[in-house]
Amino acid sequence: MQMMQRNVVGQRPVAGSRRSLVVANVAEVTRPAVSTNGKHRTGVPEGTPIVTPQDLPSRPRRNRRSESFRASVREVNVSPANFILPIFIHEESNQNVPIASMPGINRLAYGKNVIDYVAEPRSYGVNQVVVFPKTPDHLKTQTAEEAFNKNGLSQRTIRLLKDSFPDLEVYTDVALDPYNSDGHDGIVSDAGVILNDETIEYLCRQAVSQAEAGADVVSPSDMMDGRVGAIRRALDREGFTNVSIMSYTAKYASAYYGPFRDALASAPKPGQAHRRIPPNKKTYQMDPANYREAIREAKADEAEGADIMMVKPGMPYLDVVRLLRETSPLPVAVYHVSGEYAMLKAAAERGWLNEKDAVLEAMTCFRRAGGDLILTYYGIEASKWLAGEK
């Protein structure tokens, strides 16, 4: 039997032995940062090992070596042209009203305040807004007829914006919850059922009234079955063939909507003794656990005439954004919702993250996942950051 060679401290292992190879390899990566003349290498910390360069044909870091080169090979870019700015409107006073759960966001007083607010982001390239009116309680009813009042707050705001900025793209919200005393997107029966087809009749009237006011894009967010096709037919019947539909295709029953409902006082209102008002919107909005269901919704919306499909919320549902991007040729919108905005604001206010970097990273992720349009309350700030402002 061959005797094992004893490793003596300071003695070089026998050439060709397994141990000689191991020791040699270890030596390659553990020698201190000293050159052959005994002097330390310059430009690296003392103690940095001297190694034999790896024989790598591909080194991905070469394409990350400088900001200029990184920019030249960047796969997606974010532009203010991608942003749609949500605006909340009220007329309870002539003053803007801060929304406590959305720092930096106000309910804008109808009139000059709205014009002034929209003018600023336009100067940075944000030329799309979506209008959300806060309806006074005395105008809310169980059947939400205020939704299609031709002189309602939403309709007047659309006219105001189009008169002031003819080239502004004005999107609207098509749903009954801002006008419904029960706080739901559809009409609620006494038994607590959201009436699908009856609701659609009023959604069609709402969409037509918005188109008559000058809306460029109507956006059904209600999640009633068949509403896109019905709205398309209603618009075409009234001569609005050029008005687009951005469907909330995959709108999830999410916990991230809380601040938005604060802004419009539009949360469900259960607890009535004689009526079973659902405490949430889970019978019509999608289950957060579901992925394949989004394909079914997308196929239906595309077949019914949607021009744009939306995923809401955004960051927790990037897989669904990618799914729609890969299964449909239609533009995909992503809603960076109020809860996502509030979380970023809260963390930034406490110094837990760099707000600018985090927001622009989020916008980039929406684009990388396949989003063409981004509805975001950061529209003004992000456009300024993209322009180089601090």
UniProtKB/Swiss-Prot annotation:
Residues noted as binding 5-aminolevulinate 2 in the record, renumbered to the chain: 338, 377
EC number: 4.2.1.24
InterPro entries from the UniProt entry: ALAD, ALAD_AS, Aldolase_TIM
Cofactors named for this entry: Mg(2+)
Pathway entry: Porphyrin-containing compound metabolism; protoporphyrin-IX biosynthesis; coproporphyrinogen-III from 5-aminolevulinate: step 1/4
Targeting signal (transit peptide) range: 1-24
Highest taxon of source: Eukaryota
Binding-site residues, 5-aminolevulinate 1: 261, 281
Main location: plastid
Active site: 251, 312
Localization of this protein: Plastid, Chloroplast
Keywords: Allosteric enzyme, Chlorophyll biosynthesis, Chloroplast, Heme biosynthesis, Lyase, Magnesium, Metal-binding, Plastid, Porphyrin biosynthesis, Transit peptide
Single Gene Ontology BP annotation: protoporphyrinogen IX biosynthetic process
Region ranges (Disordered): 34-69
Pfam family, one: ALAD
Cofactor remark: Binds 2 magnesium ions per monomer. The first magnesium ion is required for catalysis. The second functions as allosteric activator.
GO-annotated molecular function: metal ion binding; porphobilinogen synthase activity
Catalytic activity as recorded in UniProt: 2 5-aminolevulinate = porphobilinogen + 2 H2O + H(+)
Coiled coil (UniProt feature): none
A GO cellular-component term linked to this record: chloroplast
SMART domains to which the protein is assigned, alphabetical: ALAD (SM01004)
Function (record text): Catalyzes an early step in the biosynthesis of tetrapyrroles. Binds two molecules of 5-aminolevulinate per subunit, each at a distinct site, and catalyzes their condensation to form porphobilinogen.
Protein family (similarity comment): Belongs to the ALAD family.
Cited PANTHER family: DELTA-AMINOLEVULINIC ACID DEHYDRATASE (PTHR11458:SF0)
Assembly with partners or alone: Homooctamer.
Name of the protein described by the UniProt record: Delta-aminolevulinic acid dehydratase, chloroplastic
Gene this chain is encoded by: HEMB
